[in-house]
A protein has these predicted regions:
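Hydrophobic helical membrane-anchoring modules
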Residues: 228-247
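N-terminal glycine-rich phosphate-binding loop and ensuing alpha1 helix
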Residues: 14-72
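Short aromatic/hydrophobic "clamp" motif used to bind/position activated sugar donors
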Residues: 120
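Short aromatic/basic micro-patch
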Residues: 4, 39, 129, 184, ...
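Conserved N-terminal catalytic core of the sugar/cofactor nucleotidyltransferase
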Residues: 47-117, 197-200
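Residue-level signal for inorganic ion chemistry
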Residues: 19, 46, 104, 123-124, ...
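Conserved core of the sugar-phosphate nucleotidyltransferase
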Residues: 129-222
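Single conserved hydrophobic/aromatic residue that forms the stacking wall/gate
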Residues: 1-11
């Protein structure tokens, strides 16, 4: 947001949400469409996620990257369900996760430029119950430390097995956390780390915070929430339907 003061333009740093929604979601066997677009109670899951993100009024814009086959559908759903649709930008995702992330950061900088302390909060479309606390903590943490991920201490013992037949190792559980989303960053810092990646590194990234570890950059950890789970399987989908009142 900018305002004219005297003859100078005063521009504050901005906070962007980003939602990655270009995946195919093959582990939900009961649906032929990507899980983020499965409708519950007349709305796709991604809209529930967006509604929770928009509860945080600090976001200037939220960018949603979707597959081209769902671009028109997503635009229609936003217009139908989101009163603050002027805050939402629908863009096309890429072939791989890193391509999609690059499309998001490129769209943001093309639309708005880039300022020193802009923050980007990158969330999964299939974590519809993200809380305001997680989002606000993520913004604050990224602004202070540059990079932030939320996670929970592992409740189960983790078994390391290369082939799924024998246990190779049992890591110390007290040192293990289950990573969630969002992953949040100072935008300029994040873009610089993106640019530093090799093509080989880009192909193996499964989580956004890996961009930091591949750049040997520290990531601050904040506490997640069990309700902020990712919809991965049919069992998860059943839980979501129950939490949304059996819709």
């Amino acid at each position: 947001t900018s305002s004219l003061v005297g003859s100078e333009m005063c521009i504050r740093d901005r906070i962007y949400g980003a939602m990655l929604a270009g995946g195919s979601g093959t582990r939900v066997k009961s649906s032929k469409i990507p899980k983020q677009f499965i409708e519950i109670g007349g709305k796709p899951i991604i809209i529930y996620t967006l509604e929770n993100m928009l509860k945080v009024k600090r976001f200037d814009y939220i960018y949603i990257a979707v597959h081209k086959d769902y671009e028109n559908y997503m635009n229609e759903q936003v217009k139908k369900n989101i009163p603050e649709s002027e805050k939402v930008r629908i863009i096309l995702g890429g072939k791989e996760r890193m391509d999609t992330i690059n499309n998001v950061t490129t769209a943001i900088t093309n639309d708005n430029g880039i300022h020193d302390d802009d923050v980007i909060v990158i969330h999964d479309a299939v974590r519809p119950f993200v809380t305001e606390k997680i989002l606000n903590d993520s913004i604050d943490c990224a602004a202070e430390y540059g990079a932030c991920v939320c996670g929970l201490p592992c409740a189960d013992t983790i078994l390391h097995s290369k082939g799924g037949e024998y246990v190779e190792d049992i890591p110390v559980r007290s040192e293990l956390y289950s990573g969630q989303a969002p992953d949040s960053f100072r935008l300029a810092h994040f873009i610089q780390m993106q640019d530093n990646l090799t093509e080989e590194q880009k192909k193996v990234i499964t989580g956004t915070s890996q961009i930091c570890t591949m750049n040997n950059q520290p990531i601050h950890l904040i506490e997640g929430d069990a309700i902020n789970f990712k919809i991965t399987t049919d069992s998860d989908l059943l839980i979501v339907r129950t939490l949304l009142g059996g819709k």
